[in-house]
Amino acid sequence: MKTALSGQVAVVTGVSRAKGIGAAIARELAKHGAHLFLTGWPGYDDEQPENGAGEQGLLLEELRQLGVEAEWTPLDLSLADAPRMLWNVVQARFNVAHILVNNACFSMRDSVETLDAEMLDRHYAVNTRAPILLSVEFVRRFGGKGARRIISMTSGQMLGPMRGELAYVVTKAGLDAFTITFGAEVGHLGITVNAVDPGPTDSGGMTTEVQRTLLSRFALGRLGRPEDPAHLIAFLAGPEGGWVTGQVLRSRGGFE
C-alpha cells in the first residue's frame, strides 16, 4: 500500500537506543513508507546511563519488518569531514535522499567552575557545526530536485534557563537561529527547514525523582514520550507539512 513517504529516503542522525527519540523517529518514518539511513556514535552513546549498546541490529530488523530498507552506520559527528563522508555513503547506498533529521546531540553538565574552551568546542562541533554542514551539503546535492525536508531537534533553551548546561544551550540556540534563516535561503528550491522542541522526554533515562518533579509542570498531565516528537516530524516530512518552514515548533505537552 502506498503511503505518504513511500520510496523516499530519510537520513536520521543520533539513533542508538531502541527507546530513544531517534529510534522513535525512525519507526514513525518507516510506518509512512520511508527507507532509512541511520547514524549513531557508540563512543559517546555507550557512556550514557541509558546506553543502548547492541540495540542497533534489533532496531534495523524491526524497521525492515515494516517493509522498508534500513541501514545504520557509526559516525563521529565531531569530525569536520563527517557531513561529507555521510552523504557520500548515503548516495552510494540509495543514490538520493529526501529527508534529513538532525537528531544527534552532545551534552555534558557544566558550570562556571568547569566550563572551558574544550567543552565549548565539543558541544559546538556536534550541536551546531555538524547539523549546519549536513544541511548545507544536503541542499547542494539534492536541492532543486523536488520536495525536500530538513528537520532538526532542539530544546527549550530560548524559553527559560537550563542551569548546568551552558555549553549545550548556546550551541542549540545557534541551531534555532540557523533554522529560521536557512528556511528563507532554500525555500525557492522546494526545501522546508524546521526544528522541533519536544520538551522533557522520558526515553528511559529519567529517575523516579525526576519524573515526579517534572510531571506537575505538564499541562496535559503526563511526561513526554519519544513518540510525541516523532509524530510531528512525520507530519513535517510529509506532503501535508510542505507549507511549514523556518519554524521552531514547540511540542511540549504544555510544559512550563
Region locations from a protein language model:
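Canonical Rossmann dinucleotide-binding motif of NAD(H)/NADP(H)-dependent dehydrogenases/reductases
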Residues: T3-W41
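Catalytic Tyr-X3-Lys loop
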Residues: H98, F106, E113-I132, I151, ...
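A conserved structural motif in NAD(P)-dependent oxidoreductases
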Residues: F218-P229, E240
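Short, small/polar-rich loop/turn modules that mediate ligand/substrate recognition or access, typified
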Residues: G187, T192, V244-G246
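Active-site helix of classical SDR
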Residues: S135, T171
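Alpha-helical segment proximal to the catalytic Tyr-Lys
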Residues: R140, I180, A184-E185, G242
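Substrate-binding pocket helix/loop in short-chain dehydrogenase/reductase
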Residues: S111-V112, M119-D121, M206, L214
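Short C-terminal tail/terminal secondary-structure segment
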Residues: L159-G160, R212-R217, A234, T245-E256
